[in-house]
């Protein structure tokens, strides 16, 4: 795979993490991209996940709301002849409509744009789609979320019976810098555990009130075994 990228930016870090280090698979638990024929990619960025999953034989629907990232996403899908569809929008727990996206300052950071207000950041208006409506429309088997905190409300809104039977794998980076509450994280993974057979993440001290470690993010892998 080859990628159009912006030199001297987080693009190189993303390529290293997703393509080379393969952070969205967890082989010890059998969490593999190929196990889900259709992936919903939330936080498409420049297309590393979309192209990686396509190379594993999967179809991908990739959401990316930030215009420049979306342009790179589209170009990289085309460059790698990936079986992926880019969509210029975000996905949220709330209603379909529009929201402000607070974009990163400077020339380096291209992947920390967020719907949560950040001091000193400019905002752009983006289209957003409701998560449950997106699930109903595309009926994915796998879901990947890396959306800078928006995953928390989405996952917290999902009761065990809300997950469609077609979904057999979910992976996400949980953003403790947006909400450091360990109790909320536990509630979310417990609800996932009531639907999925395996929920894997690094060890957490459940007795603590807040997550105060660096990096302030934890990878989670949830999967069905049958």
Where do the language-model regions lie?
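Phosphate/nucleotide-binding beta-alpha loop and adjacent structural elements of enzyme active sites
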Residues: 1-226
């Amino acid at each position: 795979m080859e990628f159009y990228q912006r030199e001297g930016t987080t693009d190189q870090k993303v390529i290293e993490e997703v393509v080379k280090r393969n952070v969205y698979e967890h082989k010890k638990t059998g969490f593999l991209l190929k196990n889900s024929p259709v992936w919903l990619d939330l936080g498409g960025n420049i297309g590393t996940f979309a192209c990686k999953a396509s190379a594993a034989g999967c179809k991908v629907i990739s959401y990316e709301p930030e215009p420049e990232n979306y342009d790179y996403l589209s170009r990289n899908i085309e460059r790698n002849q990936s079986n992926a569809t880019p969509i210029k929008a975000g996905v949220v727990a709330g209603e379909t409509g529009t929201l402000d996206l607070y974009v990163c300052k400077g020339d380096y950071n291209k992947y920390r744009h967020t719907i949560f207000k950040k001091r000193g950041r400019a905002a752009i208006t983006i289209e957003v789609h409701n998560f449950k409506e997106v699930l109903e429309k595309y009926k994915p088997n796998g879901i990947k979320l890396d959306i800078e905190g928006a995953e928390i409300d989405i996952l917290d809104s999902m009761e065990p019976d809300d997950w469609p039977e077609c979904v057999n794998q979910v992976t996400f980076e949980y953003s403790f810098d947006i909400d450091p509450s360990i109790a909320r994280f536990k509630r979310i993974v417990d609800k996932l555990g009531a639907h999925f057979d395996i929920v894997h993440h690094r060890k957490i001290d459940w007795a603590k009130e807040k997550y105060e470690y660096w990096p302030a993010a934890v990878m989670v892998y949830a999967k069905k075994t049958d």
